[in-house]
Amino acid sequence: MNRFKEQAMKIVFMVAACASVLAVFLICLFLFANGIPAIAKIGPLKFLLGTVWKPSNDKFGIFPMIIASIYVTGGAILVGVPIALFTSVFMARYCPKKIYRPLKSGIELMAGVPSIVYGFFGLVLMVPLIRNTFGGTGTSWLAASLLLGIMILPTIIGPTESALRSVSESYYEGSLALGATKERSIFVVMLPAAKSGILAAVVLGIGRAISETMAVIMVAGNQARMPAGLLKGLRTMTANIVTEMGYATGLHREALIATGVVLFVFILIINLSLSLLNRRSENAN
């Protein structure tokens, strides 16, 4: 009976694994089957490096959206990673038990807040603040980066804290025994030891930021042109897809799917690059 249960569970696990792989494969197949022909029709250089997006004139250049996605994601990482890192260090090494539970619950709650709620927060509070402080409309690259920096905090904090807690306590105690201060022991010994977990958390944060749509649409200005400055509006690749997919037909629709292909490849390259970097650093150590 036990042997039968073991075999049954193996089959269940195998089916679940195959279903997951099949789902990813079908998504990739749909994207590439519909997107690659569109890129071929438009022309790879015109599509990837074109600076004008006017579907009514058969102009499908997504270079401004690619740059906007990089700018917004980069800004979010600059805002979110330092805050998340210091928060993780505080929770793992400094936080009193009475504070830890509500703080942990609050961060987990942040992860479950819908994107549209963050978008309303940015639209009602951040955009007017930027407009009154720096001028302009307020909907801008700055607003999108700040908002995404807040949104990726729980995505980075959780894995980073776990990575810090997984480091052997002997590293910390050995550093203290050699005369290092508590802060130096954490930032010079503990953080490098947890580097692989921290890099994984940053990758998750980048994926979260670059794939975000609704919140970005609400605060970024949604302007399909080359980003002109920190206080100017822009449109990311995800925003471009969501904004126009509802009414797009023909080559226009295919070009939007092709934008999804570019976004998919973009995230894949980031993940592979950081994984390779992490592997090289581990081999060096």
Stretches with model-predicted labels:
Residues E161-R165, E169, L176, V203, ...:
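C-terminal transmembrane helix and the adjacent membrane-cytosol boundary/short C-terminal tail
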